[in-house]
């Protein structure tokens, strides 16, 4: 299986807004939904899990339902920083999936990930056991 682990645990303090930036709307859709749609549309992604701020889980679930994100399998709380948030997500996934499954970790505030980048990362993980994208 290929699982997308999206991080959306930050508060976006530099944005100086009342809501976290991943939930800010652009053209009537939250940024996190654009990111989720990129992985939802990819034929090789089997599941999506999101690491999310406490207090925003139900809102994220509602948006996922509204925008037909059917691959969402879980939402887990973030940590004190990005590293801890990723750890929380990976620990939760380790209870559900095999160590042989591929996990793509992606920043939920970066919605412009292409289908090609997702495909290339999966292919490189299969070939080498690990992959990283730097833009």
Q: Over which residues does each language-model region extend?
A:
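Conserved N-terminal catalytic core of the sugar/cofactor nucleotidyltransferase
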Residues: 33-100
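Small/polar loops that bind or transfer phosphate-bearing groups
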Residues: 7, 51-52, 77-78, 105, ...
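Glycine-rich, phosphate-binding/catalytic loops in enzymes
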Residues: 21-25, 67, 120-122
